[in-house]
Structures are given as structure tokens and as C-alpha cells.
Amino acid sequence: MIILAVESSCDETGVGIAELGDDGTVTLLADEVASSVDEHARFGGVVPEIASRAHLEALGPTMRRALATAGVSKPDVVAATIGPGLAGALLVGVAAAKAYSAAWQVPFYAVNHLGGHLAADVFDHGPLPESIGLLVSGGHTHLLHVRSLGEPIVELGSTVDDAAGEAYDKIARLLGLGYPGGRVLDELAREGDPAAITFPRGMTGPRDDPYAFSFSGLKTAVARYVESHPEASQADVAAGFQEAVADVLTAKAVRAAKDLGVSTLLIAGGVAANSRLRELAGQRCADAGMTLRIPRPRLCTDNGAMIASFAAHLIAAGARPSPLDAASDPGLPVVQGQVA
């Protein structure tokens, strides 16, 4: 079965094509992405209207490239990110996917963007066993129990304020590094000393929810430090901030795995591309005797391949097609894999 999927939840226009084998394996055939990030940089963040217009302009060419790369003229299924995400951006991708589904007369599946991030990993590491999922991106930070990609996902905890990626962008802006800030801040932090400045670790007290996150206090602490220490090394500030984020994320994820008796940790989402998060997670998983799975950086950011993978796993588990009047849902919860 050939599955073509459209991703348009934010500022990347993605079209992915995957094949679902009779044995349940999912093989990537094409992964084409067009990003409008450069158009948003001067505004310091994603502008929804610009993102929607960029999707309209990029979707056709991206679709043609994906079909050519895969050597496919007509898929057996069309899927699309139905949510969460920016309302206008979602609408463009969903409308296009429905149109292709109707024109090709093939089933349509409306699936969850966040589940897609988890499903991207199978292209690098094969079938996913029962796992603790740490999903970290610009808009989301969730700790999840994933029994399989075809079963309902259980949310253990999430951020009570800022997402991890949002905190990265805000600190990068504070340091004058521009937008998007994640990659630039990561590079700067490698030049600094993570022990030079110790920033607070939110939601780590004995009475705090062990699976919840908070990055607002950390963001404020960094801002106050920079204001009161103008002579401080930017690299040290970046390294101290990054260490605080990676410390909390990995400590809570490993704790959840131990609490639930799960031996695999999957880290997914855009922040999963961060070098210190990957390094510290590797160290802590090795110490705990756990298996760590993180997709290659290309598959951590938004793309259509991950949506094709998640749709394939839902189909393999018996999911029925979505109706063509299924509406996009900007606030779709992570526990709802599909809009049926």
C-alpha cells in the first residue's frame, strides 16, 4: 500500500510517500520539504498569514517532486496533518489532501501531527517497541507512554507554560541570535562552559508533578542574569541554559521509564535535533540500561514522511478512513491519533 501524506501545520510544507508492506513494515519512498522560515525570520517568529500563503505556493511543486522521487503516479491512500497547528496553515494542507483524495478516488486519513513525530523514528530504527516518548518542539513538550504506534497514546505529563522549543527561541532572541534560535543557540553553547552559570530547573521539587515541565521560570532567570551581568559570556549563558533544559527533559523521561518498567526512550520533535539533549540522553539511558531512539535531525523537524508513517501504522492497526468533511483542529490533543 502506497501512502502519500501532506504536512502543513506550521512553516514547513511537507509531502512524504511511504509504503506499508504486508508484514507491517513501513518504507520511506520520498520526503520533500519546502520551508518558509526565511520569510518569518525578520519578524522574530512565525507569521500565520505568511505561512498559509507559502503553503499555497509550495504545495504543488513539493507534491510533484515527491511523486517523481517515489516513482509513483497515484497512491493508494492520502493522509494529512489535521492538527494541532496553525489554523490557516492546516487548512491549506488538509484541503489539498482532500482534493487529491477525491481526484484519485482513494481513502483519506486525517492524522495527528504529534503522533507523526513519534512515527518518524521507524524510518531510522525499524518497528517501535513499547516506549516512553519525549516529544519536544517549538509548540509542544509532552511525556508519553507509547505502547505501539497503532494504539492510543497515553499522556503522562506536559509543560505547564512554555514549550522547550519556545524557550530556545526566546533566549536566542534575548541574546540577539535571531530566529529560529534553536540551531544557532546550540552551536553557541558548544563554545561555552555549561557549569559556569547554573540556572534553575523548573518543576523538580519534591512536591512537583514528576512528569510535568516548566520553562517560564528558566527563561526569566536567564533574562535577569543577562541584565545584571552584561559582561557575561554569551556562550556560557547559552551553555548554562541548554544544560538546564536537557537536564530536566532527560531526568524526567528516564524516571518515567523506570516508573513504568519501560526499557526504550524515544525522543522526537524539532528540539530532538539538539546536540546536548541527544548527548545527555545517551549517557543517562546507558547508565540506566535503556535503549535510546532519536531520529536523524532531518526527521526531527516537520515533514510529510512522518505523517505517512503514522498513517501507515494506524491503517495497519485497523483504522478506518476519515470523512472528507473532517475539520482541521488547531488544538488537537496528542492522545487523539486520528480524526475519524
Curated annotation (Swiss-Prot):
Pfam families: TsaD. Its EC number is 2.3.1.234. Its main location: cytoplasm. One of its GO terms (molecular function) is iron ion binding. InterPro entries: ATPase_NBD, Gcp-like_dom, KAE1/TsaD, Peptidase_M22_CS, TsaD. GO terms for cellular component: cytoplasm. Belongs to the KAE1 / TsaD family. This is tRNA N6-adenosine threonylcarbamoyltransferase. It comes from Mycolicibacterium vanbaalenii (strain DSM 7251 / JCM 13017 / BCRC 16820 / KCTC 9966 / NRRL B-24157 / PYR-1) (Mycobacterium vanbaalenii). The gene is tsaD.
